[in-house]
């Protein structure tokens, strides 16, 4: 089983995501845009267990994944991704809570890939976050002018916490 250390920082946006994405499309830095549906198993202690479906809008088949993510503080977390087929994903997703839906757009700036997430659930409309993965915890980072407050250390911005705020009747797959 592959185990990764994810080193990531997260921020609010100072400008609407639509403006940033349009600018990136115009200057050639826009890489990819796709939709993510993810849900979480009820609290399991040390690990957060996520079911994720990534939808590429007809450009390629959806992908399915189960991820175990170690809870903790700081910007580095152990992550264990497990590829699933559609049936495995459906079985896992039925055990999970409400589905968090977001559109992710990847933008290349310098030597970093910035991932802008626009949340699609009615309860989260207006929430727009950007994440960037780093090669090490002490890696330098030049922030674009559209990056605002850092939310890395604020638990209420973690996807698993956002999913808890969704109504129970949100679709389960």
Question: Where are the regions that the model predicts?
Answer:
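Phosphate-end processing signature that detects enzymes handling 5′-triphosphorylated RNA
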Residues: 1-173
């Amino acid at each position: 089983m592959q185990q990764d250390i994810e080193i990531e920082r997260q921020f609010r946006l100072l400008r609407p995501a639509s403006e940033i994405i349009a600018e990136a499309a115009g200057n050639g830095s826009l890489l990819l845009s796709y939709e993510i549906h993810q849900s979480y198993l009820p609290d399991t202690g040390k690990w957060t267990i996520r079911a994720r479906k990534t939808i590429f809008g007809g450009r390629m088949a959806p992908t399915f994944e189960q991820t175990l993510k170690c809870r903790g503080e700081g910007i580095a977390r152990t992550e264990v991704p497990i590829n699933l087929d559609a049936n495995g994903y459906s079985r896992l997703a039925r055990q999970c809570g409400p589905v968090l839906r977001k559109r992710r757009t990847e933008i290349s700036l310098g030597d970093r890939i910035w991932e802008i997430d626009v949340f699609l659930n009615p309860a989260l409309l207006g929430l727009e976050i950007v994440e960037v993965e780093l090669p090490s915890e002490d890696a330098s980072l030049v922030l674009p002018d559209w990056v605002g407050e850092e939310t890395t250390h604020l638990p209420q911005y973690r996807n698993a916490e956002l999913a808890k705020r969704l109504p129970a009747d949100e679709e389960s797959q």
